[in-house]
Amino acid sequence: MAKKNKNVLVRLVSTAGTGVFWVKKRNPKTQTEKLSFRKYDKVVRKHVIFKEEKIK
């Protein structure tokens, strides 16, 4: 049998308010703080901060 995966999927939502998001995996045991990345938002055509939200 395969091992159970401990990673959880999180949704990184743009702070520009455009509704653009990226989905990433994160291990809650090793990464306890919330993720935030500076990634490209294709709606505003700029790099903006994306912050973590739970996937509903």
Swiss-Prot record:
GO terms for biological process: translation. GO terms for molecular function: structural constituent of ribosome. GO terms for cellular component: cytoplasm; large ribosomal subunit. Gene3D superfamilies: Ribosomal protein L33. It comes from the Bacteria. Signal peptide: none annotated. Pfam families: Ribosomal_L33. Keywords: Ribonucleoprotein, Ribosomal protein. Belongs to the bacterial ribosomal protein bL33 family. NCBIfam families: PRK00595.1, rpmG_bact. This is Large ribosomal subunit protein bL33. It comes from Rickettsia typhi (strain ATCC VR-144 / Wilmington).
